[in-house]
Design a protein with these regions (language model features):
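Conserved glycine-rich cofactor-binding loop
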Residues: 4-5
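Conserved glycine-rich Rossmann-like NAD(P)H-binding loop of the short-chain dehydrogenase/reductase
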Residues: 18-35
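Substrate-binding pocket helix/loop in short-chain dehydrogenase/reductase
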Residues: 82-83, 87-95
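Active-site loop immediately N-terminal to the catalytic Tyr-X3-Lys motif
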Residues: 84, 133-137
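Active-site helix of classical SDR
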Residues: 106, 142
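Residue(s) in the substrate-gating loop at a strand-loop-helix junction
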Residues: 126
Length: 173
């Protein structure tokens, strides 16, 4: 998820370059279609906040790919201009996408990976999870919640031979 720009897009292109078949998803279909012109990349438009759509898209990916080995959940939003003041609606939107959206994605693949008894789920968080930053009243807490969630799920997934990992990059453009 989150493959229309930034880290998600770079990862999709890197995996494709290495010969992987890559399913990408994000809200911005025009950007997805541009990326999907590359070999081995298939676009699946998705709003991660829609739990039913997330399940539907994963089912569609399984139909096309037959098997999934790795899921990278990289969806997220951050706009420091919108977080200069505490705005509950903006904070709820950020947490809904950055935390609950990723949780929807994890939930949609959980049964598949546990039954397969193999696979890897990688969550992209942020250094903002570990330290408060200016203009980050929604973003930082959403990433901190992801970090804690991943650490908690590690124990449950490990029993099924499924790896779950967290990456916390610094600032990018």
């Amino acid at each position: 998820t989150g493959a229309s720009s930034g880290i998600g897009r770079a990862l999709a292109q890197k995996f494709s370059d290495e010969g992987w078949k890559v399913a990408i998803s994000a809200r911005r279909q025009n950007l997805l279609n541009e990326i999907a012109k590359e070999e081995n990349i298939y676009a699946f438009p998705l709003d991660v906040t829609d739990e039913n759509k997330v399940k539907e898209v994963f089912a569609n990916i399984l139909t096309v790919f037959k098997e999934v080995d790795l899921c990278v959940f990289c969806s997220g939003i951050y706009d420091p201009k919108l977080e200069q003041e505490i705005n509950l609606n903006q904070i709820k939107k950020v947490i809904d996408i950055n935390f609950f959206g990723v949780l929807n994605c994890i939930k949609s693949v959980e049964e598949y990976f546990k039954n397969k008894k193999n696979g890897h789920i990688s969550i992209v968080s942020s250094v903002a999870a570990y330290r408060g930053l200016p203009n980050s009243s929604g973003y930082g807490p959403s990433k901190a919640a992801l970090t804690n969630l991943t650490e908690s799920l590690y124990f449950d997934f490990k029993k099924h031979n499924v790896r779950i990992s967290l990456v916390s990059p610094g600032f990018i453009k």
